[in-house]
Structure formats: structure tokens, C-alpha cells
Amino acid sequence: MNDFDPTTLSSPAAIGHNLRRRPLVRKKLSEMVEEELEQMIRRREFGEGEQLPSERELMAFFNVGRPSVREALAALKRKGLVQINNGERARISRPSADTIIGELSGMAKDFLSHPGGIAHFEQLRLFFESSLVRYAAEHATDAQIALLEQTLALNSQSLDDNALFIRSDVDFHRVLAGIPGNPIFMAIHVALLDWLLAARPAVADADLYEHNNTSYQQHIEIFNAIRRHDPDQADRALQTHLNSVFASWHTLSAQSSSDE
């Protein structure tokens, strides 16, 4: 057996043998400007709050036209790396959790429209909120429990007003998401509910009170378990609630489809 010769792996003949024909991806000038500016920002050549050079200076520096500079700055803004106000030079900013989630929003909404998309997001919400209620039952302060109780009061006062009830319903779950004090949790939760609510079917007026009251009673069960600092019961109550909500949504969606 011949000895291993590593030089043969990098020889032109070996490389040519392993190559497969594929087109080179040509980058737009704006993408090249964007990448270079992003690297400069991440290397902290510009500090947070500092202004970038003017568009004209960037055009001269990169030897590109104004459209390329503006497209690059717009892309950096979407990433949360710069803020752009009319009449001012772009200013360096720090990406927030909201910015990161916002970048995913379009893809998430597109995914929801595909078969099985809603079910996958429902499972994500169930796993996520299950951890939240367990944490809340173990760690919620008296002030946080009082805030959760306030959202229940709004729940009870809006059973006949669907728009108001949805708002108080979201507030209840949002307070839960805020208990750990992690801004990423909050951003994920806000986005997740926004995506799911956008796909939520309408409830008939005749069924509105019963539908909302069911959710309200289930919220009470979750709250009572958290107040007793019982994570297992809080988790069971949350699972019952969300599974009930999901089943209701699927029933309403099926009815809506059959009516079309």
C-alpha cells in the first residue's frame, strides 16, 4: 500500500477532479458595501451612537453610486445596526431582540400559510409557555402575581367585547413571558402571538361569550396554580388551556373552509 501523500489532495489535478460545475454568485455593489460596513461596525471602528460618514463620503470611499450606498444602509437598518432619520447621517445602533425577531417575521408568516405551519407554531408556543408558567410558579414575585391578577380582571370585564378580550388575553400571556426578565423571551412571545393571531379565525357573535369565558376560566386555573407556587399544576392548566384554544381554532377554521 502506498504511503499517504497529503500534497496530492491539493494538487491541480486532484482539485480539478473534485470540482463540479456551478455558477459563481455575483454580488451586487450594494451587498459588498453592506458587508464591508457591517464588518467595520462589528470591529467597532464606529461606536454605538456615532454617525457614519455622509452618503457622498461613502460613495467616494467605496467608489459606488448613491443607490448602492442607500441600499446598503437600508439593509443595515433592517439588521438593527444603524438608525436612519430624514436629513441626518446614519447612526450606529445596537440590534435589539425585537430587531432580530422582526427579521424573521416575513419568513414566519409565509411558513404559517403552508400546510401544517400553524400546527408547528402551536407546538412551539405550547413548549415555550409551558416553561414560562413553570418558571412563574417557582419564581414570580408578589408584584408580578398582582400584575397577572390585574389582567384577569380585564379578562372578566370584556367577555362580550372580542377585541378587548383578545387584548386582555394577550396581556395575560405577555405578563407570563415577562416574569423571567429576559428581553429575548418577551420578543419571541410577542412575535409568536402576533403570527398566530393573524391566522386566527373569527368567532361567531352567538358563540363569543362562551368561547371567551372558557379561556377566562382556564386563565384562572393557571393563575391559581402560579399563586400557590405549584409548577406542575400550572403546567397542566396551561396545557389544558392551549390545547383547548388550538382545538377551537381548528374547528372554526374547518367551519370557515366548508362555508366557502
UniProtKB/Swiss-Prot annotation:
GO molecular function term, any single one: DNA-binding transcription factor activity
Domain HTH gntR-type: 27-95
CDD domains reported for this sequence: WHTH_GntR
Organism domain of life: Bacteria
Pfam families tied to this protein: FCD, GntR
Record keywords, A-Z: DNA-binding, Repressor, Transcription, Transcription regulation
GO BP, one annotated term: negative regulation of DNA-templated transcription
Record-annotated DNA-binding residue ranges: 55-74
Function statement: Transcriptional repressor that controls expression of the genes required for the catabolism of sialic acids.
Family according to the record: Belongs to the NanR family.
Protein name: HTH-type transcriptional repressor NanR
